[in-house]
Structures are given as structure tokens and as C-alpha cells.
Amino acid sequence: MKVVVIGAGLIGTSIALGVKRAGAEVELIDLDGRAEKLANDLVSNGKVSDPDLVVIATPTSSVHRVIEEFKDIYPKSTFIDIGSTKTKVKVDVQTFGDFSKRFVPTHPMAGREVDGAEGAQSDLFQGKTWVVTPLEESAPESLKLVSELIESLGARVKVMEVAEHDQVVALVSHLPQIISSLLAAQLDTRNSEELSLAGSGVLDTTRIAGSNPDLWREILNLNKEALLPLLKNFQKDLSTLIDNFDVERVLNEGRKGRQSLPGKHRSASRNYQYLPVVLEDKPNQLAALFD
């Protein structure tokens, strides 16, 4: 398989690393020349002509522009996007007429709170769910090619309707981002002495608050319609807790909800690289290695 990835950020570079590891030819393209060079150096690849697949790994607001620029450069290629919301993508793609036959909207349910190619991992999608929301026009051969790409990255294909996808990710992805950010914002008013007591509880619940604000502002605004009812329900639950302080009920319901999630073994184990190190047989050699 030959793949071109447009967008040399975390997801785009991780896709490139993964397909390269799976034996595909891959090229990364980015408007930022420095980012493009860094990503291509990491992946160690060259130019790709006549790709089977073009992955648009840019913010959703850029998808229309990228299609306009590249659909005729790669006239036979299947295109996919990897954005967190699908309604706008569907509307944008269908303005291009017959092109929509070779476009498949997708969304890998994977990521990290770090930005850019520097945080990319070849196994980022291993064992994760990768949602596909086919258009009515999406050609069967395009869908087959997309499934092959996803499976080569170790992910599981899940087919959904566009509207259903946007409703579900509002709950399992977008609402947690807002709640984590609100909690983390409380920490900004505290002094370092107080914050030195922070343990795994606050670190775990605020981890995603470290994500790129510009990227998430766009995602949340694009899915505002699905997100607002969830925020209102959350506000209602908080008001009830404040009025009644029924913490036992809240804790029990929270525990039950947590237990309804797939188990900790839902993700496959990662393949790590090992570097043999030879040390002299004398004191403090291991400590010196990490100094």
C-alpha cells in the first residue's frame, strides 16, 4: 500500500510511523516546512507517487481546503479524514460531487495530551477503536482500502452513522475534556506548596487538560449541539449534589458507571524497543546511567 499523510502532527505522524512499520510506502506533507521535515525524518521515508490512500490529518476546519488542493493531484486515490466530529466533514465533502465516492470519514479513538510529531508513536492505535462513518456515496473499494489501513495499524473498525458518532463522542471524549479543564483551572489559583501534595488522583483526572487548547476549541465548537445537553445534565447533577450532598449515591453511581467501561485489557500490549547496555561490575554504574 502507498499512503500520503497530509498533516505532520501527532496523529498524522503516528499513522505514518505505523503504516511504515506495516510495510507500506508513506510520505508526509505539511504547510509548516519544519514540521514536515521533522516528521519525514522520524519516519525515514521519501516521496510517494500515485498513493492508494490520502490521509487528511489536519483540523476539521481545514478539510475542505485540503480536498480542494489535493483531489486533482491524486485523482485516483481514496481520501480519509481523522477528525473528532463528522457532521461538518460530511457537508463539506458532498459539495465536491463525484469526489465523495472516494472519500471515507473516519475517527481514530486514540491520542495523547502532547502535540506534534515529537509525541508520535507507531503503536498509538494498537488495540484501539477506529470509527468509520461512510457516506452514502462512498465506494465499496474505498471502504475496503480504509479497513485494510486501519487493521494494519492494529486498530478495530467500528462503523457508525455520522449523527450517532457525534452524539457518542460528545459523552466519551468531549465532555471529559471540558470537565478535566475546569478542574485543572482550579489548580492555577493555588501556590506551589499546596500543589506539592497532588497525587495520582488529580494527575489522572487532569491529564487531558494539558491538550492543545486551539485544537480542542475547534472540536468543541463544532460539536456544540451534541455537547450542550450533556453539560446541562452535568450542571443539574452538580446542583443536586450541592443541595442534598448525597455523596454516597454519587460515589456508588460513579463506581457503577466506571465499571461499565470495557476492561483494562481492551487495549493490546505495546511492542517496546530494547537497547542492550553493558555496565562495568562496580558500584554506582546503574545510577550513573540515569544521571
Per-range role (PLM):
Residues S260-D291:
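A conserved regulatory-domain signal marking ACT and ACT-like small-molecule sensing domains
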Residues N191-R255:
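Interdomain hinge/lid region at the active-site interface
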Residues M1-K47:
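NAD(P)+-binding Rossmann beta1-loop-alpha1 motif at the extreme N-terminus of oxidoreductases
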Residues V66-A117:
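Rossmann-like NAD(P)(H) cofactor-binding subdomain of soluble oxidoreductases
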Residues V54-V55, I80:
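N-terminal Rossmann-like NAD(P) cofactor-binding module of classical short-chain dehydrogenase/reductase
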Residues L124-I208:
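Internal alpha-helical scaffold of NAD(P)-dependent oxidoreductase catalytic cores
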Residues L31, T58, I82-S84:
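Short beta->alpha hinge that forms the Motif I/post-I loop of the SAM-binding pocket
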